[in-house]
Structures are given as structure tokens and as C-alpha cells.
Regions:
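C-terminal active-site-capping segments
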Residues: 398, 402-502
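Feature captures the FAD/FMN-dependent oxidoreductase FAD-binding
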Residues: 73-145, 306, 321
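Short beta-strand to alpha-helix junction loop
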Residues: 70-88, 100, 184, 254-263, ...
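Rossmann-like dinucleotide-binding core of oxidoreductases
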Residues: 2-5, 9-11, 15, 19-20, ...
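Short hydrophobic core segments
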Residues: 11, 105, 131-144, 181-184, ...
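Beta1-alpha1 glycine-rich phosphate/pyrophosphate-binding loop at the start
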Residues: 6-10, 15-99, 208-209, 272-278
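Alpha/beta-hydrolase fold catalytic core
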Residues: 273-329, 333-336
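Glycine/threonine-rich phosphate-binding loop and adjacent beta-strand/alpha-helix elements that clamp
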Residues: 51, 343-411
Length: 502
């Protein structure tokens, strides 16, 4: 990078960060930018996770970028293919030369007099502190800790003589061929791992405390195949993308408005894929409503096939203690295991652990309110990417990056330099992420909040957000535009969080 000052500094070179850089290249080609990436490769999640079967749990027509058609055969794709898609996109837009690898961002300090961020990063290879400045800071570092997955207390684990691994740090030398494997967990990672490992293992047991809703979907989208045969890729892609957006929106809205009906449909579908007499209620019927937690996807019903074929089984119970040869359950049964995989979740980490300071005052993230799900009250010229909880991550990431480019062009047109979100006029606050999953509940008190009404309310609705973020007004009651040296957030708008609803 020729200069240590850029117009836009992007944190993270994963799916969101690469997309943000491409949007800048497409929509704001006059803006200078750099990307700081803590690791030594492009790809984020898709470069980090290496466990067997790693794949998307959203279709790639919506997880892919809006400007880069997904052309691979499978709609639910493997991690290697997704990683190559991200890297290919980066190359097409000349992003790699703007990336500083092995730079972990530590803190960023905003100065209103100069209308600039001063960003402190540490090189992960030399421990050297690097200082850069930027006019706009864009956090695309994901939502979880890369260096540490979540593992709950495991009673007696020190007595276990087998191999214990976490999917987030999969060992290169682990060979599970012919081994007895226990996968602890029932979320997306477990649902992915079990059928993949069952192909070579002696047997795989999915040990879950409680079940998850699992939906079998075809790995290939037959309608997409038909459309792609008749239309060029650039024409077919948005058609299939919107078809999938509408289907997922209907699924979510129906789950919210008629949860009993959706429960019955999912239960009936699972029962049809499992052996006759299988205890579907115990192992595949959760106590909560659909979309209180994310639905898991089984491409081509692979998990159900493994259970039906006897290469995998599901045990719903709690752990009493580990033994030398496996796991003893509260029921008294013991599950033998040569390998135990703790697919027990992630540790959420807001902004990748970045600390923010505005004019010498530390920003308390839980006291901020998200504006349009992408900026924080009282924090000037700062944006973050937080994807949808009920649809693919990239749908929202694309909208956020596009909206940021609209903001930058607006600032240039009007001669302004600073945009600062304001807190909502009412005192009501709700959690930013509306899920009851364990990884969310463990971290909810460390995250920003959302308000009760727009533009501080997240609606988790892509079609609605397209109207708001691509075509809506940039000037509203939620933001203030100003120049360097001007007061950006009046004192009387710095309201405390007086009430909170969960």
C-alpha cells in the first residue's frame, strides 16, 4: 500500500470483506481502500474450517454475491468450491493487492477535528504495531472468535483415552477410517459432520442434549438447472436468487405465524426419511418453535440416509461422565468412542474484538443502538456487516456494502465528511440478534441493541431491506451529516439505555 491513509479501511478478508472491496471497486472507483486481515489467506470461515463435509447451509444463489453469478452445479456447495468462488471474485476485482495479511486490528480512535479514524493493528507474525488512518472504517470481521470455539464443561474428560477434537481446529493428521466416532452437538456443524464421517468411520453417533429442526433439501436446484440451460448466467442468476429469497421468506413468515403447522410438516418429512418405527419425536422434534433457532439443512437428506443405513445413529441424552473408552450417559448407557468431536458451537465476538473510541471516550457496545443493522449510534463514519439470521449472510452483506457506497457518494455530493447515527427517541431496546441459540444467549449482553421502530429495527426481511437500503432516503431522523470539527452527536441525544426487552 503506497500510503498509510485510505478513504475506506476494511477489516476482514472473508466473504463480507471481499464483497465490500468489490462494491467499492464497482461503485466508488475513485475511493482508496485497504483490507486488514488477521490470518494469512483470503476466505474467512471458508479458509478456517477444514472438517469433513464442510459446506454451506444456505443455497449459493443467495450466499453468493449479487454481482457474481454462482455457476457451480450444486446449490448447497462444499467449502472448497465456496472458497475458490470467493478467491476468484477477489482476483476479478484486483482485491488481493489491497490486502495486508497477518494484521490483527486492536483498536480504532475517531477524531472529530480531522474527521479521521486512527487504527492500530498488530502484525501476527512479528508483533509489530502498525498505525493507519482512514476516513471511513468498515468492520467485516464476522461474528465469532476465530482462535477459540466453544466447549462446555465435559465431566471426566481427562480420563478419556481417545482423540478429542473441536471442528474449528480440525487436525490435519486425524484419520477416522474404521473408527467409532461420537459427535457431541445438534447444530449445523454436527448435522454436516455426521453423514460425512459416516462414509468412512465404523460408526458415528450424534449425541445431542436436545434435537434441532432439520430440513432435507436437494443439493442441486432443479429449477436453477432448467433456467440456466435457457438463459445466460447473468440473466439466470437473479431469477433463481429471487426465487430462493421468496421461498425462504415464506418459510420464515409461516414459521412465525403458524409454528404448529410448520412443526407438523417438518416432523412428517423427517418421519418419511427414517426407518419405520423410529422415535422421531425424541430425536427430531425440538421443544422450541421453528426459527427460534436456525433450521439445519441436510443436502439430499444425507443425515437421514446415514441413520437409515445404520452407519450413523442419534442419541438424545446428557453426559454423565467421560470414561477411558467413551462417554457414559445419564441414562446409564455408554457410547464407545475412538474419537469424540465437540461440535458444541462458537464464541461470539463483536467486531472481531476491536475496541472503538470516539473523541477520547471508549464506545460501550451494549449501550449503542444499530442503525439499519449496519451502523452504531454515536459512532461516526463506521459500519459493520451483520448478516441475516433467517437467510443467507451475504444477502445483507451485499446490501450493507452497497448502502455504504451510496453514503460515500452522498458525502462527496454535499461536501459533507461525516455521517453519525443517532440513538432512537424512545428508550425501548431489544437484543440485536433475535435467536434463542446457545451461542447467541451466551453473548447477548456484549452486543449492540436494536430499537423498537425503523430505522433502528431489524426486520430480517431481504425484500423490505432492498427498498430501504437500495432505494430509500439517505437522510432521515436516524443520522446527522456534518463536516470536520463540527459536533456530530448533540449531548441531549446521548440517552442511557432505560429499558430493555428480551
Amino acid at each position: 500500500m503506497a500510503s498509510d491513509h485510505v478513504d475506506v479501511l476494511i477489516i476482514g478478508a472473508g466473504l463480507s470483506g471481499i464483497g465490500a472491496a468489490c462494491h467499492l471497486r464497482r461503485d466508488c472507483p475513485d475511493k482508496t481502500y485497504a483490507v486488514l486481515e488477521a490470518r494469512d489467506a483470503i476466505g474467512g470461515t471458508w479458509d478456517l474450517f477444514r472438517y469433513p463435509g464442510i459446506r454451506s447451509d444456505s443455497d449459493m444463489f443467495t450466499l453468493g454475491y449479487s454481482f457474481k453469478p454462482w455457476t457451480a452445479p450444486k446449490a448447497i456447495a462444499d467449502g472448497t468450491t465456496i472458497l475458490e468462488y470467493v478467491r476468484e471474485t477477489a482476483r476479478e476485482y484486483d482485491v488481493p493487492r489491497h490486502i495486508r495479511f497477518r494484521h490483527r486490528v486492536l483498536r480504532a480512535e475517531w477524531d472529530s477535528d480531522t474527521a479521521r479514524w486512527t487504527v492500530h493493528a498488530q502484525r501476527t507474525d512479528t508483533a509489530e504495531i502498525v498505525v493507519l488512518t482512514c476516513s471511513f472504517l468498515f468492520a467485516c470481521a464476522g461474528y465469532y472468535r476465530y482462535d477459540e470455539g466453544y466447549t462446555p464443561p465435559l465431566p471426566g474428560v481427562d480420563a478419556y483415552a481417545g482423540r478429542l477434537v473441536h471442528p474449528q481446529h480440525w487436525p490435519d493428521d486425524l484419520d477416522h477410517s474404521g473408527k467409532r466416532v461420537v459427535v457431541i452437538g445438534s447444530g449445523a456443524t454436527a448435522v454436516t459432520l455426521v453423514p460425512a464421517m459416516a462414509q468412512r468411520a465404523a460408526h458415528v453417533t450424534m449425541l445431542q442434549r436436545s434435537p434441532t429442526y432439520i430440513l432435507a433439501l436437494p443439493a442441486r436446484d432443479r429449477l436453477a438447472d432448467a433456467v440456466r440451460r435457457r438463459l445466460p448466467a447473468k440473466a439466470a442468476y437473479p431469477v433463481v436468487r429471487w426465487k430462493n429469497v421468496l421461498l425462504s421468506t415464506v418459510n420464515f413468515q409461516l414459521s412465525r405465524r403458524a409454528p404448529g403447522l410448520v412443526k407438523r410438516v417438518l416432523r412428517r418429512a423427517a418421519r418419511g426419511l427414517l426407518p419405520v418405527g423410529y422415535d422421531v419425536d425424541r430425536h427430531f422434534s425440538p421443544r422450541y418453535n421453528p426459527w427460534d433457532q436456525r433450521l439445519c439443512v441436510a443436502p439430499d437428506g444425507d443425515l437421514f440416509t446415514a441413520v437409515r443405513d445404520g452407519t450413523a445413529s442419534v442419541v438424545t441424552d446428557t453426559i454423565d461422565t467421560f470414561t477411558a473408552s467413551g462417554v457414559r450417559l445419564t441414562s446409564g448407557a455408554e457410547v464407545p468412542a475412538d474419537i469424540v468431536v465437540t461440535a458444541t458451537g462458537l464464541n461470539l465476538l463483536a467486531l472481531g474484538g476491536l475496541t472503538l473510541r470516539v473523541d477520547g471516550v471508549d464506545v460501550d457496545l451494549p449501550s449503542t443502538v444499530a442503525y439499519k443493522g449496519m451502523m452504531l449510534s454515536g459512532v461516526p463514519n463506521f459500519a459493520l456487516t451483520l448478516g441475516y439470521t433467517n437467510a443467507s449472510w451475504t444477502l445483507k452483506a451485499d446490501l450493507v456494502a452497497g448502502y455504504l457506497c451510496r453514503l460515500l457518494r452522498h458525502l462527496d455530493r454535499t461536501g459533507q465528511q461525516v455521517v453519525t447515527p443517532l440513538p432512537p427517541p424512545d428508550a425501548e431496546r431489544v437484543p440485536l440478534i433475535d435467536l434463542r441459540s446457545g451461542y447467541v444467549l451466551r453473548a447477548v449482553d456484549t452486543l449492540p441493541k436494536q430499537g423498537a421502530t425503523a430505522p433502528w429495527r431489524l426486520h430480517q426481511n431481504y425484500a423490505r431491506d432492498v427498498l430501504l437500503m437500495r432505494h430509500g432516503r439517505l437522510t432521515d431522523e436516524g443520522v446527522r451529516f456534518s463536516r470536520a470539527g463540527e459536533v456530530t452527536v448533540p449531548e441531549d441525544t446521548r440517552r442511557p439505555v432505560a429499558s430493555e426487552r428480551r
